[in-house]
């Protein structure tokens, strides 16, 4: 099951017509968003604790690594050089999400696979030449990342883990500035239900 929370007029349009807006990832960093929405989707900072041996293996001057160094915290900023389009849904039916997303409605999508198929098909037409992919968000504890490889479009700080996101990403081939795109999937009334508060 997927859920999308929002204003009644937008959720009604999503349910009745399959109409949705896909934003550039950079849009979410704007200060007018609340704390549940605002995030730098183009970068993620993590902090790794490396042993002396590991540091010696990766630096160009291993002879300069002090002998008495046991470990060192190294700060990394994983970032995307280019913007991408992003659309998120959740698997969580927590009442808190109505408040966090300033929502008075939600669409409950019962058939995840059919919604995914429709969105990716409509996305192929809306984002020609873009590489599309989707997946569950990977929540990263910046002090204890499980890997030094971070997939920025699918990754988020673990403070957002309660949102249980599934992300749809379209990565354009060009580096031109992006604007939102309105995408239409057709009515979702066969795979979803609309809840208005």
PLM features: residue spans?
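NAD-dependent ADP-ribosyltransferases
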Residues: 1-197
């Amino acid at each position: 099951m997927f859920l999308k929370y929002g204003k009644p007029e937008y959720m009604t349009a999503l349910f009745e017509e399959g109409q949705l807006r896909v934003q550039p990832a950079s849009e979410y960093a704007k200060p007018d968003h609340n704390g549940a929405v605002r995030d730098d989707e183009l970068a993620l900072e993590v902090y790794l604790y490396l042993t002396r041996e590991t540091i010696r293996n990766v630096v160009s001057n291993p002879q300069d690594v002090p002998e008495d160094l046991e470990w060192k915290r190294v700060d990394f900023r994983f970032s995307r050089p280019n913007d991408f389009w992003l659309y998120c849904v959740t698997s969580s039916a927590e009442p808190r999400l109505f408040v966090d997303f300033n929502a008075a409605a939600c669409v409950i999508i019962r058939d995840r696979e059919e919604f995914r198929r429709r969105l990716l098909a409509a996305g192929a037409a809306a984002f020609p030449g873009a590489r599309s992919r989707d997946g569950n968000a990977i929540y990263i504890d910046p002090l204890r990342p499980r890997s030094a490889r971070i997939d920025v479009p699918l990754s988020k700080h673990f403070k957002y883990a309660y949102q249980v996101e599934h992300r749809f990403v379209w990565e354009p081939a060009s580096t031109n500035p992006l604007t939102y795109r309105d995408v239409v999937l057709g009515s979702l009334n066969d795979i979803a239900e609309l809840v208005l508060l």
